[in-house]
Amino acid sequence: MLEGCILAGSRQIESTTNNSVPGAPNRISFAKLREPLEVPGLLDVQTESFEWLIGAEDWFQRAVDRGDVDPKGGLQEVLEELSPIEDFSGSMSLSFSDPRFDEVKAPVDECKDKDMTYAAPLFVTAEFINNNTGEIKSQTVFMGDFPMMTEKGTFIINGTERVVVSQLVRSPGVYFDESIDKSTEKTLHSVKVIPGRGAWLEFDVDKRDTVGVRIDRKRRQPVTVLLKALGWTNEQIVERFGFSEIMMSTLEKDNTAGTDEALLDIYRKLRPGEPPTKESAQTLLENLFFKEKRYDLARVGRYKVNKKLGLNVGQPITSSTLTEEDVVATIEYLVRLHQGDQTMTAPGGSEVPVEVDDIDHFGNRRLRTVGELIQNQIRVGLSRMERVVRERMTTQDVEAITPQTLINIRPVVAAIKEFFGTSQLSQFMDQNNPLSGLTHKRRLSALGPGGLSRERAGLEVRDVHSSHYGRMCPIETPEGPNIGLIGSLSVYARVNPFGFIETPYRKVVDGVVSDQIDYLTADEEDRHVVAQANSPLDGDGRFEEERVLVRRKGGEVEFVSASEVDYMDVSPRQMVSVATAMIPFLEHDDANRALMGANMQRQAVPLVRSEAPLVGTGMELRAAIDAGDVVVTDKAGVVEEVSADYITVMADDGTRHTYRMRKFARSNHGTCANQRPIVDAGQRVETGQVLADGPCTENGEMALGKNLLVAIMPWEGHNYEDAIILSNRLVEEDVLTSIHIEEHEIDARDTKLGAEEITRDIPNVSDEVLADLDERGIIRIGAEVRDGDILVGKVTPKGETELTPEERLLRAIFGEKAREVRDTSLKVPHGESGKVIGIRVFSREDDDELPAGVNELVRVYVAQKRKISDGDKLAGRHGNKGVIGKILPVEDMPFLPDGTPVDIILNTHGVPRRMNIGQILETHLGWVAKAGWNIRLASDGADGSTEVPAWAAKLPEHMLSAPADSIVATPVFDGAQEGELQGLLGATLPNRDGETMVNSDGKAVLFDGRSGEPFPYPVTVGYMYILKLHHLVDDKIHARSTGPYSMITQQPLGGKAQFGGQRFGEMECWAMQAYGAAYTLQELLTIKSDDTVGRVKVYEAIVKGENIPEPGIPESFKVLLKELQSLCLNVEVLSSDGAAIEMRDGDDEDLERAAANLGINLSRNESASVEDLA
């Protein structure tokens, strides 16, 4: 499989980043190193794989230019594999070729709006050949609608945006393993030949020193039986393996004489109970390993086998089945490995090293990207179709057959649909913010069909491996059961034609580092000596030091002379993923906390006003642009018109381009996706320039949170255990306010009793409730709604009612039916509120496509403005997370000497044991960036000299001063040094009163807002970037008075989604018993839970102001009796005088009478949907 060539373009990093994107903000960078390679397209892993699948022109051109890759698309490959389909006699055949696509049926936005799939019709040329007459019939055949990838690397399936995650699997090939026998403590060796498709072949040396073989995981046999079955004589075996004692002893123990006996022996093991014949045994063995239909090593497997065993190296790959030479070379390799040889002479004469394989090495694990996953699914669909075609060939008249009559496309369409709809690797896209979407597309999963399972995966496969360097991020992985099984592609990594991940290195020749970029797989890297990116170089690219720190195979680190170095890293951030590369001062954070920081950035919600970080890493711009949520110019020109909804650009070639904005759209996760222009009419724009910001972006840079003035100190114990204290200013000024949009949907269907109707005419509802509904019964845009309010009025027929004889006579004469309807309106779910911002109505009358039986569909969008509140979760980028414990009035917050109150107070205890010191350094640099600096001014001597201090000697001229509110970048592993930080803190600009607030140690004297007294010790103060996470208290807080009950036990349901109650469990009952609170306990176990009669009577007593009646028998007790009776145990309940009490299954009459009198229904059972509960 091909991932296109990424050309290495050289670029000099000056001390500002973002130079490669026109109009980008000028971020002052502390980077010391030059990066010779631009960050590649971050979505290439998705887009290029899909281009390979459909054989897109761009991909085809790249493949032809590259030369070492078969320029054949994935669909073409599958069709060639399938063709020709022949009937059982071989007299007819059907071939497929030339897959091509028509235009997509509808644009992306329309597909999302109307719940359609973004797809294009696929056509192939089908050729039917009658081999008897030589007649050829050719037709263009429609093969179904094929889901297409959007520009952002996603798929729209039934209106929802989905991502296909790349899968990490063990590569087909030959794997040698070593183990210790527990009884004899001997070293045993084994080898597995793993195909892409087909039976496994395993060889091993056991503790008795015999070489055995297992075919298709069946019983073990001497390996010489297999060799004889392949036609080898004893003499040939001795000639090839005479050097090995264990092979000779195996041959002696083998009782089979000749090929025929060996074949029959194998057949008996594989097909026990079936009568063996020489022909059937020969056919079985050939089918198992030597027929392409049954056995497929895949191109990658053939490549790996050739490389391992030294066969046909450098020759083009033609066959993908096993050969006799493969089997023999594998056995020889195993034997030599067991006897301790270091090398083996391959049949071609080359020497290959003899060693065991590490299955967790990235040379043995490959990536199945989108294109290959879909290709495999199409292969499954086509093989099902093949059976149908064969059957139809035999049943239809030869003269009347055309390709169209033979082909049934249903299996193919169903296979594609099944993959996108239900596969573990086709996932609902994470759209919390642009970074979460980008990371989702770059995710690598070891789970899924053909992969590992959570339960089976051990520690080794989850662990960080030296071969991950530059390929998979060692930091970013989920916490919990999936840790280590799901990873993220490193920034510079790409995927090669065989699916192995490659990473770029700079070529070093005789100690001189060149700008030539070579992409190496993990196998190739093991053969070289690699220096790190920050090894000091002189002006000619030579290493400054004689001894250079390098790494060798297995991640071993040592010092070697400069002439021994083969390659050098291209960038210090080469090993990490995009999210991890956005953590400033990552090098000062513990890995566990950095993991949390990388993961929590993906949970940040877009705020009403986005703000880019004062302290960034230089990765923000590329991440935001490649995520695809900003609007970028296609052609350079001049902005002609700007409005909130669109931007028109007159291009230099005279064409006019209109770019539309997404306005307050709902993302998959209910966050608000809104785009707003950042250019003005008349402004000149270049190709690739950002025209409009999206959610979580500012001036085209990723902006996930806010820069807040932070004080790191304890405050009256209110920020104990990671609690956070906030200033009320953040609430009043909507600094941390986010907009959340919920979609509510209702449809009007045909029922057995008649059609449902969307109407304003709802029975038993007052006019006040209907005030905001229009004449159709749909709420107006702009209406404020609370839980329980009607959004769309709907009535459902209830069926005929009992009529008096007189009414029946009238109905018979006039033909009218007494229709009764019940209210099934769409209401705002419990605990939600907001403002109606959009309504979409789809109707069969307007020729909209609707599911069968649905006449009308209404969608209502309700937006909620959520201010920050107690209980919301905030986090920094270093894994420093906490819940808001208290929001203080501004006047009570600690303040700086000039009267500036801080925004947020974090506890000091959250830093030392978590070892994420990056947050402290970020706070210091944040203050420096906000205040601005002038190094010359600070070092001004008494004699008026303005010499630059030693710590600033390496800084370029324009970094010696910066105005207030500057933005800076400190790239990972190449950022601001501690000495620079300390110097800059001493060189910050004074405020308008001429005072510097923060000392050179980063601390300031703070004053208590309540008393005005200074705190006894100076406090660390600065600006930290704080994210508001999606764990909002409004989504979690919940209370219930009456609600639904479980059908069997009649106890209240649990959880907010079910509008459930709080469980009073076994241990809580013990606590009540311990305190002797008998009546409280009785209440909890009966009338507050499952005493069906008692709870209605209690409600009645409360309404009428009477005393609470005695509790009855709880339903769960009756369930217990039934369960005991079902075990044939006769259980009776006796009264105090010993008489048996009759247990009724439910005092239904009392219950119904009481409920009817009160006009309530307390005994709501489990309901089908949450809407019914409100």
From Swiss-Prot:
It comes from the Bacteria. InterPro entries: DNA-dir_RNA_pol_bsu_ext_1_sf, DNA-dir_RNA_pol_bsu_external_1, DNA-dir_RNA_pol_su2, DNA-dir_RNAP_su2_dom, DNA-dir_RNAP_su2_hyb_sf, RNA_pol_bsu_bac, RNA_pol_bsu_CS, RNA_pol_bsu_protrusion. It catalyses: RNA(n) + a ribonucleoside 5'-triphosphate = RNA(n+1) + diphosphate. GO terms for cellular component: DNA-directed RNA polymerase complex. PROSITE patterns: RNA_POL_BETA. Its EC number is 2.7.7.6. Belongs to the RNA polymerase beta chain family. HAMAP family: RNApol_bact_RpoB. The RNAP catalytic core consists of 2 alpha, 1 beta, 1 beta' and 1 omega subunit. When a sigma factor is associated with the core the holoenzyme is formed, which can initiate transcription. This is DNA-directed RNA polymerase subunit beta. It comes from Mycolicibacterium gilvum (strain PYR-GCK).
